[in-house]
Amino acid sequence: IRRWVNHFGPMIATDWRRPKAHTIWHLDEVYLKIDGRMVYLWRAVDAEGEVLDVLVQAKRDKQAALKLMRKLLKKHGFVPDLLITDNLRSYGAAARDLGIEKHHQRARWRNNRAENSHQPTRRRERKMQGFKSQGSAQRFLSTHAAVYNTFNVQRHFTSASTHRRFRAAAMDTWLTAVAAT
């Protein structure tokens, strides 16, 4: 299964990316322990809970924040109306370097959208008994984000019948993607 995910996962993840992200982005970082050392998982989530991107880096500094922000801006092609982060100063320095500091907002409690998006990763990490390398973590988490976005339906916004329709459509998408590979 792992070889299949490593081979076909990036292709499936690329096909499933949403064309347009919401204009409010939440950025956050959390540590992961890989092979006995601490690395940082940087994650960007939009206001609707869709994971925009993940990045696994060895450091938690301005360069890592810059790399994530540049990657997001290049991928989505626009500057968000609002960029919400926690109080890590690296975000402010990176936003200043990119010239988007007027869109940046530090908010301790408004960043819960990004904080909560780490929970599925923590569950997967426990089930997999950790990640073996930084590269394998990056590959898995990128693919997992695409699959999560496909099946994640904001349940509290929908009725049960609509939720079932969304899940059926997501399953059809999954079966089509798996059959194509």
Descriptions of predicted regions:
Residues 2-23:
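Short, basic alpha-helical nucleic acid-contact segments in DNA-binding proteins
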Residues 3-7, 54-77:
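Active-site beta-loop-alpha junctions of metal-dependent nucleic acid enzymes
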Residues 35-51, 61, 69:
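Short conserved beta-strand segments at catalytic cores or DNA/RNA-binding microdomains
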Residues 127, 138-181:
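C-terminal domain-tail junction helix/linker
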Residues 1, 28, 44, 49, ...:
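Mobile genetic element proteins and their domesticated derivatives, centered on retroelements
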Residues 107-124, 132, 137:
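RNase H-like two-metal-ion nuclease catalytic core shared by retroviral integrases
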Residues 21-34:
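Two-metal-ion RNase H-like nuclease active-site motif
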Residues 80-91, 108:
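Acidic/histidine-rich, metal-coordinating catalytic segments
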